[in-house]
Amino acid sequence: MNNNSRNECLRILALLVLFFSSLFIQPVIGGQITSPKKPNQVLFDFRLNQTSNPSRIPLSTQRRVLGRVFRRYLSDESKCNPQLETGSVSDPLKGARDAGQIVPSILDVATGSFTATGRTETLYLISVSECNASHADNFGTKRVAIFAGEQLIANVDVDFKSAIVRKTDLNGDGVDELLMTAGDIHQGILTEVAALIEFRGARLHVIEDFGVVTEDSCASEMPGSSAKASVVSMSEVMPPTMPKLRIQNYEAGCRKTKRWRFISNGKMQ
């Protein structure tokens, strides 16, 4: 091998060593070694079809739970008093609850530590179904009841949230959060809102209100109908700090196979 060929081989070898070394050497910023930035993790993608799979709750459990949460309630809608007068009170739904004119049912159940670290608890999502509740009232209020064994720890209104879509512990403090949604259909337009909620200390705390996360007007068949949906992602989880949450919004036509395109960041307008 002549000198020119040997020099060319050495040059190529040096370039290869430099290339592979760069794959393993961490960047240094301000005298400190930094790790490559990790991509955001998806907390929930509302573009995906959601299948409701609520847990089956034995009738005996339902009766026990509802009996602890409500002093009086009805077992059937047919027993509602059609002459119930709540027009004189500022909150007709509260008037119905106070009168025992409710037909409650358990929508879902979850287990975890919801009010305090290390406590084993069962959370029940309840549809109160006040007898006078209309479509405008989302057919009644929704509540969460949390039990530790037989002890009722919390009984709080959840602002019409009717579904649990994910249980998390984002800051690793041992207290679980819930991503909850509420939906409504009006004139063929489906609207869904979401919030990340916790019940620390037996009180409701809204960690993040995401606002509208789904707006689908396809069923209305109006000109220009479309489907809009949000993707909620989070920065790297570094306990005990709550990760930063980010909303990205997408839109698609009304075809069966959706082709989503990015439209905005932040809460959907």
Where do the language-model regions lie?
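Short consensus segments that form the blades of beta-propeller domains
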Residues: 99-101, 130-138, 156, 184-189, ...
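Eukaryote-skewed repeat-based solenoidal scaffolds used as protein-protein interaction platforms
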Residues: 158, 162-165, 172-194
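Acidic, small-residue rich beta-repeat scaffolds with periodic aromatic anchors
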Residues: 18-19, 25-93, 186-269
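Repeat-based blade/solenoid architectures
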Residues: 90-109, 156-165, 213-228
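Blade-edge beta-strand/turn elements of extracellular beta-propeller
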Residues: 150-158, 202-209
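Bacterial N-terminal signal peptides that target proteins for export
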Residues: 3-14
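Beta-propeller blade signature
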Residues: 139-149, 194-202
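Acidic/hydrophobic-patterned starts of short beta strands in beta-sheet-rich repeat architectures
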Residues: 113-127, 169-184, 233-247
